């Protein structure tokens, strides 16, 4: 316990509180059990430590990492028992997916220690409703993704810009601060700005995130063999070189020597882990149940990291739009254009010379153009979709 406390103190000292992710003020910190899920490298640990540092008494709090060597000889329930007996009130467990019986033991801690507030973070691959120890009725769950363009501007350039809604974008109600050049940093954001890494070789860091996700997180959750994990990496490479594409599961399965159904499962794991995005057909408003129409890499920064020289700017634009909108609202494939949001707003994404041919006589149709600073009528600048959170 002493070593855990010492590690906790060191992490608190090293935690900066000058910038907060969008999720920081959306979490109901009063809930008895909170789960924060998200891909690797998007700032979950920092967010938790910031909350402790700014809002909680140190003596009442304990932060631990589930992969700490302490848990080689101690159980999570033992730690909670000891912490509660010492008067502890707030227990934070980072990377819970690295602890084997995490769901069962969190349930026991919740049921036996009503005096404790528990927060855990984990890979977005996890499904808390899966299995015998369903936490979905106990934990208030949140999912966080990488930096928006708005957050990138604040973190790396000190430019503060309020978040806006989709309605404000469509109504052209987004005010540009005096002197702000919206395109000045946009290309850099697309290439390297989705993950909050500031020092060193950004591309190397992102490759490490991808490798750890594929080699550790997904196999651990899905109980995959080493051979299947290798095929997962090959599948991601295929997607990186050809996204967006209409998936032919049988053809891909033949390349990887995996059944069609298994390919669909592997794609689902990659999607949950924040490595790809699957654009589906509409199913009467039930998001996530439609047929997969196109597969994208999750975000533009992944494209520049994984696709090498095969970077198509049109793909980058569509990927950015899909990534920034789908975490906030239902996004499906449009039968006449690129994307359909909320089942009623049609969006065509392209460069500044993009025409409106496909949207003629279409109600609620919008053209999203790159390389323009301001919008008019039904034309919206692409960069503004980075202001949604």
Functional labels for PLM-detected ranges:
Residues 194-337:
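Accessory nucleic acid-recognition modules appended to NTPase machines
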Residues 2-10, 123, 130-236:
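Interdomain motor-coupling "hinge/lid" segment immediately C-terminal to the ATP-binding subdomain
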Residues 36:
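Hydrophobic anchor at the beta1->P-loop junction of P-loop NTPases
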Residues 321, 325, 339-355:
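Conserved catalytic cores of phosphodiester-cleaving nucleases, focusing on short active-site segments
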Residues 58-90:
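Short glycine-rich substrate-engagement loop in P-loop NTPases that contacts/grips substrate
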Residues 92, 117-123:
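Structural recognition of the conserved hydrophobic beta-strand(s) that form the central parallel beta-sheet
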Residues 1-26:
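N-terminal pre-Walker A segment at the start of P-loop NTPase domains
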Residues 44-45:
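Conserved lysine of the Walker
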């Amino acid at each position: 316990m002493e070593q855990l406390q010492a590690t906790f103190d060191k992490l608190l000292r090293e935690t900066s509180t000058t910038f907060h992710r969008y999720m920081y003020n959306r979490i109901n910190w009063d809930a008895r059990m909170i789960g924060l899920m998200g891909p690797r490298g998007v700032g979950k640990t920092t967010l938790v430590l910031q909350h402790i540092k700014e809002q909680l008494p140190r003596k009442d709090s304990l932060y631990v990492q589930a992969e700490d060597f302490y848990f080689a000889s101690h159980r999570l329930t033992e730690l909670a028992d000891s912490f509660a007996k010492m008067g502890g009130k707030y227990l934070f467990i980072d990377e819970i997916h690295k602890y084997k019986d995490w769901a069962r033991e969190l349930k026991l801690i919740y049921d036996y220690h009503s005096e404790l507030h528990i927060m855990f973070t984990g890979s977005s691959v996890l499904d808390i409703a899966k299995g015998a120890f369903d936490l979905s009725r106990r934990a208030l769950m949140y999912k966080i993704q990488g930096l928006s363009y708005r957050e990138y501007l604040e973190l790396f350039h000190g430019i503060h810009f309020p978040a806006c809604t989709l309605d404000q974008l469509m109504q052209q109600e987004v005010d540009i601060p005096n002197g702000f050049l919206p395109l000045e940093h946009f290309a850099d954001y697309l290439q390297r700005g989705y993950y909050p890494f500031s020092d060193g070789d950004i591309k190397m860091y992102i490759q490490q995130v991808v490798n750890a996700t594929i080699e550790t997180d997904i196999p651990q959750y899905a109980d995959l063999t080493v051979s299947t994990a290798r095929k997962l990496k090959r599948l991601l490479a295929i997607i990186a070189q050809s996204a967006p594409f209409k998936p032919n599961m049988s053809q891909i399965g033949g390349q990887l020597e995996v059944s069609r159904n298994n390919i669909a499962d592997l794609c689902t794991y990659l999607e949950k882990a924040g490595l790809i995005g699957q654009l589906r057909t509409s199913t009467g408003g039930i998001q996530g149940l439609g047929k997969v129409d196109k597969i994208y890499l999750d975000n533009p920064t992944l494209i520049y990291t994984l696709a090498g020289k095969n970077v198509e700017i049109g793909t980058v634009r569509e990927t950015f739009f899909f990534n920034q909108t789908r975490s906030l609202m239902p996004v499906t494939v449009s039968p006449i254009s690129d994307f359909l949001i909320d089942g009623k707003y049609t969006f065509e994404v392209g460069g500044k010379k993009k025409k409106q041919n496909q949207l003629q006589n279409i109600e609620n149709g919008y053209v999203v153009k790159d390389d323009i600073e301001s919008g008019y009528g039904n034309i919206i600048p692409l960069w503004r979709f980075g202001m949604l959170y």
